[in-house]
A protein has these predicted regions:
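Subset of outer-membrane beta-barrel
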Residues: 11-288
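N-terminal signal peptide c-region/cleavage motif recognized by signal peptidases
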Residues: 4-5
Length: 288
């Protein structure tokens, strides 16, 4: 294989089909919002029929503190595309203002991202230094706001406020540009046993078109969920999940609307735990 362009270019944030299950990954204001201890992990394999396709592993945990007025948590994400790997570690903090029916939350996060690449099996003309193995760690910080009621939530966030550039082969290369997220969801009670929850996620970054996710989920007996979603009307998916006591398990299958669908399918699995470990925590609902 012969290449003649840079191996490391501006990176996108990882995609999350189950963003509504782990919203703190995109908005720190969700830390502690359900007045419980929460821990979740997920694995995503994108374009599973393609060698070197994107894979993402993430963990996030957060807890409500000080009579549920504060939330604190942590995030760990590893995102890999071919030989390019980004690893993020960070902490989150949120302050909650609780009204009678609405909670306002203001969140911040800070941490480090390690950008690395190890180009192997690539024939490079003239030993281009841009293709040498690379590793650099950058600090970043982000903010988010959230308004949440009994049936709805609306959030706006910039998880990483700082753009990042590195010097490679005597050239300055931008490796990250800010992403802006707008999230909304509403819960409809169709009957005592059936709930309908549509959610939307808008993602905007400089140099890329607006990305829009729309999900429509049905939940039965507050335990079993099935849903459909689309991203930009060119990717479609199916979601199923179930709650077993304080544990929730979920699975997503995605297909592109055009092209070689069998080669570009995507799988995403998740597991979450919700506990009431403090006397001030919500003892009547898991928050799922």
């Amino acid at each position: 294989m012969v290449l003649g362009s840079t191996a490391l270019s501006a990176q996108q944030d990882p995609l999350y089909s189950q963003y509504f299950n782990n919203p703190m990954l995109i908005n720190p204001a969700f830390a502690g919002i359900h007045d419980r201890l929460y821990a979740g992990l997920a694995y995503r394999s994108q374009w599973s029929g393609i060698d070197g396709g994107p894979t993402t592993f993430n963990f996030n945990g957060h807890i409500a503190l000080l009579n549920n007025k504060l939330g604190a948590g942590m995030i760990a994400v590893q995102d890999k595309v071919g030989d390019i790997k980004n690893t993020q570690y960070g902490g989150t903090f949120a302050y909650h203002i609780k009204g009678i029916h609405t909670t306002f939350s203001f969140g911040m996060q800070a941490g480090f991202i390690r950008y690395s690449t190890d180009i192997q099996g690539v024939l490079v003309r003239n030993a281009d230094p841009l293709f040498a193995p690379f590793s650099e760690t950058k600090f970043n910080t982000g903010v988010g706001i959230l308004m949440k009621g009994e049936r709805y939530s609306v959030g706006l966030s910039v998880p990483q406020l700082l753009s990042s550039s590195v010097s490679m082969g005597g050239q300055s290369i931008q490796i990250y540009q800010q992403h802006y997220y707008l999230y909304s969801g509403y819960l409809f009670y169709l009957s005592e046993q059936i709930q309908f929850k549509p959610t939307t996620l808008l993602r905007l970054t400089h140099g890329a078109p607006l990305s829009v996710d729309f999900n429509a989920n049905l939940t039965f007996n507050s335990l079993y969920t099935a849903g459909l979603f689309t991203r930009n009307l060119n990717t479609y998916g199916l979601l199923v999940q179930a709650i077993f006591g304080n544990v929730r398990a979920g699975y997503v299958f995605e297909l592109p609307g055009k092209g070689s669908a069998l080669n570009f399918n995507t799988h995403e699995v998740s597991l979450a735990l919700s506990l009431d470990v403090l006397s001030s925590h919500n003892h009547s609902s898991t928050g799922f």
